[in-house]
Each structure stands twice: as C-alpha cells, then as structure tokens.
UniProtKB/Swiss-Prot annotation:
GO terms for cellular component: cytosol. NCBIfam families: Pglycolate_arch, PRK01158.1, SPP-subfamily. Its EC number is 3.1.3.18. The active site is at 9 (nucleophile), 11 (proton donor). It comes from Pyrococcus horikoshii (strain ATCC 700860 / DSM 12428 / JCM 9974 / NBRC 100139 / OT-3). This is Phosphoglycolate phosphatase. It catalyses: 2-phosphoglycolate + H2O = glycolate + phosphate.
Length: 231
C-alpha cells in the first residue's frame, strides 16, 4: 500500500538527547512536506506543546498528543478520554512514595497521568494499578511514565488523525524510539525504529536506522521517501 503520510515521535526521534530539535530532522521533515507528504507529530506531551511544535517545525498534518489521548488539526481539538481512576492511583502512589512527582505539565493534561520516571519505577506503578484493580496501563516512554486508559495509545491516536486526512492508518509510516510507539506500529503500514530504541520496538520494525536520535529520525524520513518512490 502506498504511504501517504508520516507520523513521527518528537523526543528522542527528531531531537538531540537533550530534547533540542535536531537540524537534520528538521530538514528531512520539511523535505517530506515539500513533496506533499504531511507529517503528523505524535507525542506523549501536551496538545499545547504539540501544536506549538507543529507550527515552529512546519508540519501540516494533525498532531497526536498525550500518547494518543488528544488530537488537534486546523484549530480543532478532540480529547479521547478523561481522568478519574488516574487520580485514585496518584493518591495511593503519594501515600506510599511521598517523593514521587508528576510532570509540571499536568495542569494542561486531560487524557492521562504523567509521572517522572526518576521518582518511581514503572513496574511499581503497574503493581499498584493491579492491587487497586484499576482499568489503567502504565507505559515508560523513556522520558516519563504515562498512565492512561487501555484504549488510549499512539495507535488509536493515529487512527483518529488519519480520518482528518482522509486516509487509512495503513497508508501511514510511523517513526519512533520508545515502548509507547509499539501501539502505533500495530496500526500503520510501515514501521521504523530509531537506533537507540528498546529491543522490542526494533524487533517489530520494518527498518531500524543506523543513526541515533535526530539523525536517526532524519534517516528514517529519507528512507521512507525513497522506499515509496518520492525521491
């Protein structure tokens, strides 16, 4: 199937390790856009962050934020979940681990809880979820722990974003570097993992870049453009 759009993670995929945007990734994104291939930014960050990043980087596709819980396109926002059990979990975590911290972005979030991974282990979070019998999942993005409803993920976000573009998810190629990109891999037509990605993501990829971080993201975009006849 012909690839008509590229969805791509932000942190670690089009950035340096310190999260600064990588100029080579920026050039690759703009090259794809110039060829008529819309880029969809897909991130665990807030919808406000994703919208701003899209404007500054120069992408034309929808943005998928909050790990799939929020979609924004042409000044229209859709939230696919709300938080209830997440706060029950957080109250319990705070009782047991007083030093645990959520992201400073929590006041802007509506679809999931984000816990700083240096303050608690993701396996511990999962154990507490099971103890409390909550209908939640915890995913380590490599930058933070994202806690959300089971149906909220990058894959479901890409499915919804594809509707805005009038294409099928299988007509999207996805590029990522984290565990939370696995759900995206399940719905798209072509999958690329950046070199520093965890083993499980690489095992499920159609292509693994030779370079890491933003250089790897740039390599991924050019690879997709060449493979599907745009270059």
């Amino acid at each position: 199937m012909k690839i008509k759009a590229i969805s791509i993670d932000i942190d670690g995929t089009i950035t340096y390790p310190n999260r600064m945007i990588h100029e080579k990734a920026l050039e690759a994104i703009r090259r794809a856009e110039s060829l008529g291939i819309p880029i969809m930014l897909v991130t665990g960050n807030t919808v406000q962050f994703a919208e701003a990043a899209s404007i500054l980087i120069g992408t034309s596709g929808p943005v998928v934020a909050e790990d799939g819980g929020a979609i924004s396109y042409k000044k229209k926002r859709i939230f696919l979940a709300s938080m209830d059990e997440e706060w029950i979990l957080w109250n319990e975590i705070r009782k047991r681990f007083p030093n645990a911290r959520t992201s400073y972005t929590m006041p802007d979030r509506r679809a999931g809880l984000v816990i700083m991974r240096e303050t608690i282990n993701v396996e511990t979070v999962r154990e507490i979820i099971n103890e409390l019998n909550l209908n939640l999942v915890a995913v380590d993005s490599g930058f933070a722990i994202h806690v959300k409803k089971p149906w909220i993920n990058k894959g479901s976000g890409i499915e919804k974003a594809s509707e805005f573009l009038g294409i099928k998810p299988k007509e999207v190629a996805h590029v990522g570097d984290g565990e939370n990109d696995l759900d995206a891999f399940k719905v798209v037509g072509y999958k690329v993992a950046v070199a520093q990605a965890p083993k499980i993501l690489k095992e499920n990829a159609d292509y693994v870049t030779k370079k890491e971080y933003g250089e790897g993201g740039a390599e991924a975009i050019y690879h997709i453009l060449e493979k599907f006849g745009y270059l």
